[in-house]
């Protein structure tokens, strides 16, 4: 994460079998290109044991165009961050410090969420 100091960093942990992950992924994709948020890095991290093809199909089915796929299929990062399930979103400020953790699905396009997030951007 230190490579991204100066940026707001969002780690979103998900899996292809997770219905709430499927619900929130399109709004996370839109957040990536939100013109009101600069210096924003988003890493959607698949914690399942899926192959790349299954993950790509998940993104294709949801028309995800702005995000890359990352993997933590041996759950190293998930364990380091003491994750309890998916979806979980962990937010880091520009100094690389965790400032929020969202457990469960949210709408990343929600006006109140965007207003709150802009305070850290």
Model-derived features with residue positions:
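A short beta-strand-turn-helix
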Residues: 1-9
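Proteins that catalyze or organize thiol-disulfide redox chemistry
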Residues: 2-3, 29, 115-121
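Conserved redox-active cysteine motifs that mediate thiol-disulfide chemistry
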Residues: 5, 13-30
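Soluble periplasmic/extracytoplasmic beta-strand elements of cell-envelope proteins
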Residues: 12, 44-46, 101-103
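Structural microenvironment flanking redox-active thiols in thiol-disulfide oxidoreductases
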Residues: 22-62, 73-79
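Short, conserved active-site loop motifs that form the nucleotide-linked donor/cofactor pocket
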Residues: 40, 67-68
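Thiol/disulfide oxidoreductase modules built on the thioredoxin-like
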Residues: 60-65, 72-118
